[in-house]
Each structure stands twice: as structure tokens, then as C-alpha cells.
């Protein structure tokens, strides 16, 4: 069941076989109710623009994620134009098969879908097309994937990222042009003062921040609650959470070094890890596009916690690469043989950070990338291997679906940013479709 709100609008004309069309509508509605949390729909096929307007007036104010326009029979472009007067969400156009071949063309649904797609293209409105009957598995899978992508498109358009401090010196890839970001992806930014957070968080009374320690103890192995760095982790996390709530933030991009070590006296990795584990994806080094990449992966993968790492090693014999970071990783990503183990930052030797290898499984690797020419997407696939922890900190060895050496050279020559987001599960098809919907160049390695 997808947690999404779909506006289902079955359209037809009475000059076609409306009785057969109604059977299609009933089966479609039954399937939608079984797979989407909320479905808003008329009680029968809408057969005139006047009838459609009456229905649309009756549902004004409803918040939806997707418009599902089913051309149950042929209908002209007036219907879609009327819907666009009321709703600006992306549209899925659905055509069904003819019930029989030979004699009268009973529905002409495919031409109706063709006509509607033409209207949407000429209105420069984002849309997708699906074809098939509601009981066909291939149609169901495609439609679910499409509905999920549409939901993420809407979530992106509402995404508000808290940027906690500027990016470290020389980390130019972490920045974003706010106007271009809003125009291309719909994302907005909220700037926060890191030094102010350091100053104020240590003033918080224990009863306010102790809950963060107790939360960490539920999953982190070897956590010493008496360690001063654990206290500072909890204080800082609590302070930031207040701003997350007051500003209604959906994700974070946080400056980490050198400030955390020099000014707070604690590693940032624990805060990044716990926030991401609990659904507030947080990138390090104030990587705004890294945070967006993590957010998209979590949304498409059903809430699975994503990872963000550098590509640090390649093993040509195993056709594998290693993604690593110095101590950030959501707890649930840990290899079950070790669990999410507490440690110190591998270079600064300050706690508390995470220190574990990631679990095995199918993974999708992704990056929302930016160049002087604009935005592009990178989509890769592989399998995380069940191996010993490659490097201190958090790391994962991934056997790629494509030739690792060739892929490495292509990534470098294309100048991708050195942070790659990763999530467990295969959402490559979703990402490719997302790129099409956003009209972005999408490079695929699957």
C-alpha cells in the first residue's frame, strides 16, 4: 500500500460502449483502493465537460499527489484542459485495451490517451502514459512505479532543506544556487548558523537532551553515555531538532569539519547518523545536492535509510568499488555480524562516530549532479558484498553491474561530485523515470 493521494478521473463518451467501459472503471477503482492509501474519484465515468466541472468543484481544497486520467473511451482534449484549471500536479494518462477485435471499435481508449498526451505536451505539463487493463501485472507494476515517482516529484517541490553552516573550504560541489535549485527541482533552502548552535546547545538542561542518548542506546553498540562527546552529541541534536520542528524542515545539509572538532569538541557523525536513521536525511560537508539525493532515495525505497559516501577504492578482480565516509551511517545499515558500533573519528580521534561495515544486499547508487550546463542525474546499480569492513569509519564494498574500471574512468571524466548516495533495493527504473519527468540528462550504469 502506497501512502499517497490519487485523484482518479475516468473519462468516456456515451457514443462508445459505456457499459464495457464501466466494467473497466470498477476494476480500476478496486485495484487503486487496494494499493493507494487515498483515492478521490467520481462515482461513475465522467461523460461531459460540464459533469467534470461539477465534480472538480466538489473536491476543491483536497490535497493530492497525482492526477490519474483514465481515457476509458476516446474523449477530446477539453477534459484534460479543464482538469489543468484546477490541479497542477503531474498527470498519469491511462489507456485500456479494446475488449474485442473485429467489428465495431468499442472504446478507442488508446486514441483518447494519445490525444490527452498531446494536450499535456503542448501545455508543457509533466505527465506519463501507461497502457493496459487493471488486472494485468505489468500494468500494475508500471502504474505503482509511476505513482511513486509522481509522489516524489510533489515531495521535491515541497522539500525544504536546513543548511547548517557553509561548506568547508574548497568543497565547492556542496553549494547550490538557490534560484536555479528552486526552478529546476522545486527545493528551497533555510540557512542556519552553526556557531550559534554550538553556543546555545550546551546550555540545554539534561532533561531536554537525555532522550537522544537513550534513543542511540537502542541501536548503538558500545556507547558510553558518560562520555563528554556523547553528551555534546545529544545537546547539539536536541537543539537542531527544535529548529527542524519550528521551520518544518524535511532534510539537512550540515557543515562538519573543522568546526565540530575545534569548536564543539565532538564528532558530527553521530548526529548525522541518528537523524538519517530516524528519517531526517542529513548530508555532511553541507552537501546540498547530496542531501537531495539521499531524500529522493529514501522516498523511492519505502523509507529505507540511505548512505552518503566517497568512492575511495576499486578492485578490478572483483569488479567492485568501495564507498566510505569517516563515521556517518544510519544504524540500520550496519552489517548484522557487528551491528552499529560506536567509535571515534578515524583522523581526529574524537567521538562519537560510527565504525562499521555496511550490510550485504542489492543497492542503487545515485547523485543529483550539477554542472555549469545545469542539472543531471547519475543512476548506478550493484550488490553490496558481505565482506570485512574495508576501512575504519563506515564503508561498503559494492560489486557494480557494469565494468568497474570503465565506470570509474567515465565518472571521473564526466566530473561527477565526490559524494554518492546509496540505498538498499533497486529503484533504478524509478530514478530514470524521475529524470524524464524533470527533463534532466540521466546517465545510467545498470
Curated annotation (Swiss-Prot):
Signal peptide: none annotated. GO terms for biological process: fucose metabolic process. GO terms for cellular component: cytoplasm. Its EC number is 5.3.1.31. It comes from the Bacteria. Keywords: Carbohydrate metabolism, Isomerase. It catalyses: 6-sulfo-beta-D-quinovose = 6-deoxy-6-sulfo-D-fructose. Induction: Induced by growth on sulfoquinovose. GO terms for molecular function: L-fucose isomerase activity. Belongs to the SqvD family. Part of the sulfo-TAL (or sulfo-SFT) pathway, a D-sulfoquinovose degradation pathway that produces sulfolactate (SL). Catalyzes the isomerization of sulfoquinovose (SQ) to 6-deoxy-6-sulfo-D-fructose (SF). This is Sulfoquinovose isomerase.
